[in-house]
């Protein structure tokens, strides 16, 4: 009887260890994916920040590689340029890394849906407000250029607005998303205030 109990215990222990090993491998794989994503962000050509500098009073709207240059944070020209994911993010445990990746995904989906479903109508309203009508092509470029900068802004706010321990993840994700959405609106407003006449739609035809 004793031998059977020991044998059963050892089998259960071995099963538990194997499950934990699998879980650790999954976490390591997710951590590598996060590190790869961070490295990719650092290797990007900085969204031509050196040229645009996110200062809309100096902004010249130009096409570089087929895109427009829309700065997501005109009031803080150094925030994106100085943002380094690897240096700003402290060394945290794998579980926290996993939670951070999940939050990032939630926020990204929230803002991406906002850009797809709400911004086109908001952009049209702002065009009327600033008397700066865009044609469909330039309107598309504006939204897509902002979409490319979305991850940088999310990382920026996640590094500066820490999640409180008792804050539900969904509430924190919504809070960060709202900050990014406000940046989007400000960027569009500044863009429309300084848009060159040649980029405006032919509304008088």
UniProtKB/Swiss-Prot annotation:
Keywords: Germination, Sporulation. This is Probable spore germination protein GerPC. GO terms for biological process: sporulation resulting in formation of a cellular spore. InterPro entries: Spore_germination_GerPC. It comes from the Bacteria. Induction: Expression is sigma K-dependent and negatively regulated by GerE. It holds the Pfam family GerPC. Required for the formation of functionally normal spores. Could be involved in the establishment of normal spore coat structure and/or permeability, which allows the access of germinants to their receptor.
């Amino acid at each position: 009887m004793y031998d059977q109990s020991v044998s059963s215990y050892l089998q259960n222990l071995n099963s538990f260890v194997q499950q934990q090993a699998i879980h650790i491998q999954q976490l390591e794989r997710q951590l590598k994916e996060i590190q790869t994503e961070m490295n990719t962000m650092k290797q990007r050509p900085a969204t031509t920040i050196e040229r645009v500098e996110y200062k809309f009073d100096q902004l010249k709207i130009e096409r570089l590689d087929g895109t427009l240059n829309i700065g997501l944070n005109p009031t803080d020209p150094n925030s994106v340029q100085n943002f380094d994911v690897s240096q700003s993010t402290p060394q945290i445990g794998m579980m926290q890394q996993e939670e951070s990746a999940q939050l990032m995904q939630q926020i990204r989906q929230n803002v991406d849906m906002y850009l797809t479903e709400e911004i086109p109508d908001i952009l049209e309203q702002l065009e009327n407000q600033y008397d700066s009508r865009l044609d469909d092509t330039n309107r598309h470029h504006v939204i897509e250029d902002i979409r490319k900068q979305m991850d940088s802004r999310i990382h920026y706010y996640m590094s500066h607005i820490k999640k409180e321990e008792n804050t539900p993840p969904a509430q924190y994700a919504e809070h960060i998303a709202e900050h990014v959405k406000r940046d989007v609106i400000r960027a569009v407003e500044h863009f429309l205030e300084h848009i060159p006449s040649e980029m405006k739609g032919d509304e008088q035809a």
